[in-house]
Amino acid sequence: MALDDIHTPVLLERCLELLAPALQGEGAVLVDATLGMAGHSEAFLDALPGLRLVGLDRDPDALAIAGERLARFGDRVNLVHTVYDGIGRALDGLGIGEVQGVFFDLGVSSLQLDRVERGFSYSQDAPLDMRMDGTAGLTAAQVVAEYDELELRRIFYDYGEEKLAPRYASRIVQAREVEPITTSARLVEIIQQATPAAVQRAGHPAKRVFQALRIEVNQELSVLARAMPAAVDRLAVGGRVVVESYQSLEDRIVKRELRARSTSTAPVGLPVELPEHRPELKLLVRGAELADQHEIAQNPRAASVRLRAAERARRRHA
């Protein structure tokens, strides 16, 4: 199967349009913090012959596929196995200080969803894993088995925004006392049995629970909250950051960081704005951009995307 059949990059032309002005110089460095199968990065490298790419991913399978896809670019590409909050350490390891661009395409990748054995999908039976890096960390089965009812309720509320969190947490605890919950099909069955018929008609009842478990297993929100400031800190003046998020919890973190850094810190009433109070960032899009209907028809994954972008306007003063 061709790679483009597995994953079509979302808003590719718009991302390139936003990043390209900062990446024209020979040797300009772009960090793709969520490399995946490198669909975006391959296009960036093709369009910008002087570009150097640093690709980060926590998933060894994705890195292997990306490595093959980008092999033709030779030493213009460096790949690093790390979570994206490790951007600073990754750049230090390569001897790179400032960069001209950082790109994030957040959420679970098509590769991970399509690999049934990874357990991300509630529509196919598989071991309850959900780790983006299958070589390390807590599995979803362990969360379901070991977290108490209050902890399960918390993550379903906080990470899934699930109104039926108390009901689902209670039923899971009851069910695991009878036998371990080790597969996605068994978890879906428990959730469906606990869901009122009227709610089931509104959409798949397991969607938010699976999202919450995935976020908890991979610590996605806490990682993003560390990664955003780390990425901005590495941008050279004139450098740009572009972020694609796919659910409101991620987008809030991105919005908060970009808004804070694009706002003057001058005290109220100060007659003159001092240089150290000027915004570090200039926003490049108004609010969050969404995909149009044509893009969504071509690539259904784009339906939920929210794109934000900013340019580094000044260095942070000590």
UniProtKB/Swiss-Prot annotation:
SUPFAM superfamilies: Putative methyltransferase TM0872, insert domain (SSF81799), S-adenosyl-L-methionine-dependent methyltransferases (SSF53335). GO terms for biological process: rRNA base methylation. One of its GO terms (molecular function) is rRNA (cytosine-N4-)-methyltransferase activity. Keywords: Cytoplasm, Methyltransferase, rRNA processing, S-adenosyl-L-methionine, Transferase. InterPro entries: RsmH (IPR002903), SAM-dep_MeTrfase_MraW_recog (IPR023397), SAM-dependent_MTases_sf (IPR029063). Its EC number is 2.1.1.199. It comes from the Bacteria. Pfam families: Methyltransf_5 (PF01795). The keyword NADP does not apply. It catalyses: cytidine(1402) in 16S rRNA + S-adenosyl-L-methionine = N(4)-methylcytidine(1402) in 16S rRNA + S-adenosyl-L-homocysteine + H(+). Its main location: cytoplasm. It is found in: Cytoplasm. S-adenosyl-L-methionine binds at A38, G39, H40, D57, L91, D105, Q112. One of its GO terms (cellular component) is cytoplasm. Specifically methylates the N4 position of cytidine in position 1402 (C1402) of 16S rRNA. Belongs to the methyltransferase superfamily. RsmH family. This is Ribosomal RNA small subunit methyltransferase H.
